[in-house]
Amino acid sequence: MINNELKDIFSSNDFNSKTWINNLLSDCGGSGSSSGNAKSNQQSILTDQNNIKAELEIENICSNYLSKLQLYQIELNISLESITSESLLIVPKSIREVDRIRKESLHLKNRIKSISSKIGEMNNDSPQSMETVSVIEKLDQVKSRMEISIRSLKEAEKLLSFSKTVDQLFSSNDYLMISDKLEEVKQSLSVLSDVPEFREQSKKFNVYQDRLESQLKQPLQQSLQQKDLESCKNYLKIFTNIQRQDKFFIYYYQVRIDPLKLLWNSYSSSSSSSSSSSNFHNWLSKFYDEVLVMINSEFNWLSGLCPIDYIQVLENLIIHLFTTINPNVQSRIDQAITIANQTTQQPIKVNELLSIYKTTCSFLKSLSPIFPNIINSSSTPTTSPAVDKLFKVIFEPYKYFQNKFSEYEIKSVKSQLQSISPILTLQKKSGGGSGGSGNADFTNIIKNIENQFIPKSFQIAQQSIERFFDFTHTTDIDSYVNTVLNQIFTEISLILRDTINELKFITGLTTNYIIGSSGTFPNFNQQQQQINTPSSINGEVDPVKKLTNSHTRSHSRSGSGSGNSNSNSVGTSATLQNWEYFQGAMNLLQSIHQLLNKFQQFDNSTSLNIIHYLGNSNNSNNSSSNNDNDQFICNIRKFLLGKDLNKIQKLQISVQNLENIISSPLPLSSSSSVSKDQSISKKPLLLQESFNQISKLLSISQHFVYETLIYFIKLKLKELPKIVSNEWNNNNNNNNNPSQNNGGGGGGGLSYISQITDHLLTIPQQLDPYSEEELTRFSLSTSLQYPIKTCSNSEDDFYQNLLIQYQREKQFDDEQLLIEKLKEKQEQQQEQQEKEQQQEKEQQDADQDININTNNNNENDENDEDDELEDGIAHQWITIVAKATEKLYLQTIVEIITLNEPSCQQLSNDIGYLFNVLSALGVSAEPLLQKTQSLLEMNRDTFTSFYHQQLHNNNNNNNNNNGNSNNNNNNTNNISLLTNAEKNICNLIGKMRNIK
């Protein structure tokens, strides 16, 4: 064990014998002096024995080391002696060589001097030197000509020999030897090209080459078919020798693509037995698989045939294949994507076209392991022309469809939209519908718009964008945006317009239809005859006859009866509003608002997605996993754009417009509905035309809500002239004191105005569920910017004038409120300044805090002002309906033919009652209607005097206008304060009251 330990110690690389011996001796000395007791003596004895053994081992090892060292020393001495002796022998030889080289350099130097001196002598202009040079030059020319002649004679001899043995040579079938001989003949002909006698041989040489090629054709094709690599190598060498290497590869391409050509041509017979639309797509995928099998096989085989440029040969093989089949590709794709028995109105199968195209892209990507430049960022037209040819030959048939993509896509999308539009049409029933079927259809259509049509429409639009990315790679943004995207939302708007016309037809509330998708106003001839029937609509009860108990209200004016004389009034035909139609119209308005909001998000996301798509595919430094795919798309885009500067410039302009749209700052939002709409319209949009169409649809939806609210009032006011002429005037003529009798005509008047006011007072209850729904807010700016166009121009003008008047009044009220707020602010600021001046300078820090709080309060005050300027949703609608009611009331009064005095008082009381209700609703009275009331409440004598004064004033004005009077009438009567409209009302009332 000790021996093993010692071996380990001495065999280590860092063993130091001197240090180890000293350490061992020191340990032995220390252990001998430390024995004190019996136990320690025993241990020391054992230790001594071990030390003795160790010392013996050390002596043996040391002796061995010493002997080895002595031997090494002897060997080293011997080697040093031998090396030294050899070095001593070499030194004299080296000295002699150095001396020899020195002598040679001196001799060479002397020779150079001698030559330079001779050259100098020859450069002298002596006649002797010039003659010598001339003789030498002539001799050199003679020598060169003799050499050329000798070479020409040898080449001529070769040609003569070849001509004699050419037939025998070709009959030997040693094609390699023939090619070598032809190569020699070619060289000989190049030498003898200036000899006229051998020019005819040059023509024969081409014949010899053709003869050799014709003999090689059949065996070459057999060898290529059998993939005999050695034979093909020999044939390639032969064709290379005769400068016809291209012909060799042409034969190679023909042999390799013939089976694939047969497979390609076999599709016509297979397709005739199958009419499946996906037949060509599936077959093309299998065809590409066969091509890939061939390419992988040839990749390995060609590396043995031509190791240097086999990749280029393989690329040319693929190019030849697709060049051969391309004339039929476009027609087969067109046949595959065309619907059977297609007319010009039917769309093509765009999804099928995209599937075929994606299959081709996948095929080209699968070639990237062999041709890395297909997806390599370094692939450029200058570095890889073969790859560019590969892209061109494979994608060339699709270029036609990519240029027509927008045309195909819009037809397909319109077809998809039309396929989902039946959910918005009236459900036809075989047997007459019940009284509630109209309501059911109305409600279902509204729900389908929100829950199905709008989401599906955006899904269709998003899928169209994805197809645009996948098929055209954004090479023609402008055409797609204008031809497809804008047309999609235009079609959506037209479908919804048709739906609103359907809803109007269902409700029967109006016949003022809007222009539909056909570009004309709809004509519901047969249906309209049923609508005009007072008792039914499509076999259903008139909508205003449908009673809703929860909406029933009872109103009476002070001093009037209970309204028990309604049997002869307009209330006999219709007494209550059907609020289900109003609720549906409000839900429709919400849906259209949601459509507009979604559209704005869609427009923004579309711009971002296009820029993102272009950025990814153009960024060659992208390190994501999709880098290869992005570069592949970029290469396809380069091929599609090519060198067409118009397309490139058009794409650059489109991208610049998109970047401007994205980078444009969002307008500051405001709490005001009007300002919100204006800010939205100022934001540049990609699909501005679509935004206008949807905004127009929003304006139409708001008008539809207005129609559901105003219809009942129109219906009640429509019968007022008949009530006045048939009931009021007759009853009051038979009654000496009509003002105290509320049972006859007065009861009729009470019934109509009471129902109108009941309707107006019910509107806030119906609007209450929508008071917090911003999507039901009336957008005044939208309605003014996008006026409606129905089949009734008078109704359109009435509605637009109503909105303009409402806008003016609202602006005036807002300005007055702002003025009051500014005054309050100024007073508060003055008070604040006075307080700040009174504060001590030591409280400067506190003053700063106060100022900060003051600024925050000012900002909050501004927001509060905006909130105060904004009308509530319910108040908006109530105000519009109330203003319309007043205007309709005026129009109805104008239609009255005659009025007796009690009827005037009755009508004045009705107007006053309406004003009281409007005041309770927070709506100001119409000034012209107020003046009408004041004229009606005058007794006959007072009005007669007033009327005559008005006529007299008009005559004076006419005289002044004709220059017959020098001074204006100084009459300061109230009549001078009448406006033209009020004068017209006064004249009409005078005619009604038969004032002469």
From Swiss-Prot:
Biased composition (Low complexity): 557-571, 849-858, 953-974
Keywords of the record: Golgi apparatus, Membrane, Protein transport, Transport
Signal peptide start-end: none
Region annotated Disordered, chain positions: 533-571, 828-867, 950-974
GO CC terms: Golgi membrane; Golgi transport complex
Basic and acidic residues compositional bias, start-end: 828-844
InterPro entries named among the record's database cross-references: COG7
Locations listed in the record: Golgi apparatus membrane
Membrane topology field: Peripheral membrane protein
Chief subcellular location: Golgi
Domain of life where this protein originates: Eukaryota
BP GO annotations: Golgi organization; intracellular protein transport; retrograde vesicle-mediated transport, Golgi to endoplasmic reticulum
UniProt record similarity statement: Belongs to the COG7 family.
Quaternary state and interactors: Component of the conserved oligomeric Golgi complex which is composed of eight different subunits and is required for normal Golgi morphology and localization.
Role according to the record: Required for normal Golgi function.
Name of the protein in its database record: Conserved oligomeric Golgi complex subunit 7
Gene: cog7
